[in-house]
Amino acid sequence: MFSKQVTDSPAYKWFDERLEVQALADDISSKYVPPHVNIFYCLGGITLVCFLIQFATGFAMTFYYKPTVTEALASVQYIMTEVNFGWLIRSIHRWSASMMVLMMILHTFRVYLTGGFKKPRELTWVTGVVMAVITVSFGVTGYSLPWDQIGYWAVKIVSGVPDAIPFVGPFIVELMRGSTSVGQATLTRFYSLHTFVLPWFIAVFMLLHFLMIRKQGISGPL
């Protein structure tokens, strides 16, 4: 995997002696890839790339976004009109969000149609389904952050859906909104979910997902 010039360097030997870098590199580069693998098996990787773009562009916007009902929309407009390349960063964030959802759906169909969810890969499928739910949650929480008319009413409708559940419905609605009505507490909760809670959850399940794929390998043809 590494050139002879690199492996002969003192720095490489120092790290290899302590961390067995060469053994790790050999394991990565020698992993068997079935001959039936085609471009459709790259959809999961493309979904990951979209997530990384989301993370980078979202992190950049947190420097300027203000999660308050009075300043949220103005801060988004400031990003779009005043911040250098802010319009591009936010546009890429929106485009990659749509692309991530699309790639996730296509990846799910590919895995289902090729039987990649069958024994012994049931847990890999379960972690993928959990990540799909988290991805949709990203979309719901992120859609509200500009706190414009569309975002406000989207939050009001989405957070009101659980109200139809017997007994616990009103409790869930108040838990989501942070109050009996949609307001600052709701925006704060959605912002916290979108920028902190959900990224940690999806990172953990991604790690589990990739470790299981690494251990079990790519599923064979039907």
UniProtKB/Swiss-Prot annotation:
BP terms from Gene Ontology: photosynthesis; respiratory electron transport chain
Matches recorded under PROSITE patterns: CYTB_NTER
InterPro entries: Cyt_b/b6_N, Cyt_B6_PetB, Cytb/b6-like_sf, Cytochrome_b_N_euk/bac, Di-haem_cyt_TM
Protein name: Cytochrome b6
Stated family: Belongs to the cytochrome b family. PetB subfamily.
Sequence positions that bind heme b 2: 93, 194
Cofactor: heme b; heme c
Pfam families attached to this UniProt entry: Cytochrome_B
Entry GO terms, CC: plasma membrane-derived thylakoid membrane
Transmembrane segments: 39-59, 97-117, 123-143, 193-213
Miscellaneous comment in the UniProt entry for this protein: Heme 1 (or BH or b566) is high-potential and absorbs at about 566 nm, and heme 2 (or BL or b562) is low-potential and absorbs at about 562 nm.
List of residues binding heme c: 42
Localization: Cellular thylakoid membrane
Function: Component of the cytochrome b6-f complex, which mediates electron transfer between photosystem II (PSII) and photosystem I (PSI), cyclic electron flow around PSI, and state transitions.
Entry keyword set: Electron transport, Heme, Iron, Membrane, Metal-binding, Photosynthesis, Thylakoid, Transmembrane, Transmembrane helix, Transport
Oligomer status and interactors: The 4 large subunits of the cytochrome b6-f complex are cytochrome b6, subunit IV (17 kDa polypeptide, PetD), cytochrome f and the Rieske protein, while the 4 small subunits are PetG, PetL, PetM and PetN. The complex functions as a dimer.
